Amino acid sequence: MKKIILIVLLSIGFIQAEEASAKVVYDLTTKNLADFERKVLKAVVANKAHYESKLKELEVTVVIHGGSYRYFTVDPAKTEYKTDKALLADYANLKKRIKSMADTYDVEFLMCGAGMPKHGLKAKDIVSYVKIIPNSTIGLIDRQNEGYAYIPIGD
């Protein structure tokens, strides 16, 4: 009888532990800097605060492809993005904010490796906290199969 009670209590604990976190995957393709700042940088901070106020954790993954490669380069001035004046004007600050998302908020950044050559990018051109994956579809499928809510952020 004690074993049954223990199993029931452990099962309840596991169920509650699963309910203690929420998960979201952002499908990031936008090249619009204002949208990126509002829908990712500011939104993640606000959403994390919301869930923390409810004693829940929010797990965040951002899958990078399309027009969004530009935000994750070591130096956009040495890439095809060298003509994006808005990006170049604020990139030092932007780069710090994005790194803070990885370091402070434990945001996972996954980049589509298949699209990198189209943009003239190699692994050495990408900031160190971004993990390069074979393609964006794999990242999105994997996270959605793990129960992540899907949020597209495109143009």
Q: Where are these predicted regions, by residue range?
A:
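N-terminal targeting signals for Sec/Tat export/insertion, comprising classic cleavable signal peptides
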Residues: 26-56
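Surface-exposed patches in mature extracellular/periplasmic domains of secreted proteins
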Residues: 51-62, 111-113
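A cross-taxonomic marker for long C-terminal extensions/tails that follow the last structured domain
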Residues: 73-155
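Structural recognition of the beta-strand scaffold that forms the well-ordered cores
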Residues: 23-27, 61-64, 108-111, 152
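Acidic/histidine-rich, surface-exposed loop or edge segments in extracytoplasmic proteins
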Residues: 18-33, 76-81
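Solvent-exposed coil/turn segments that connect beta secondary-structure elements
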Residues: 31, 65-68, 114-115
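Acidic helix-start/capping segments at beta-turn-to-alpha-helix junctions
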Residues: 58-73
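Sec-dependent N-terminal signal peptides
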Residues: 4-13
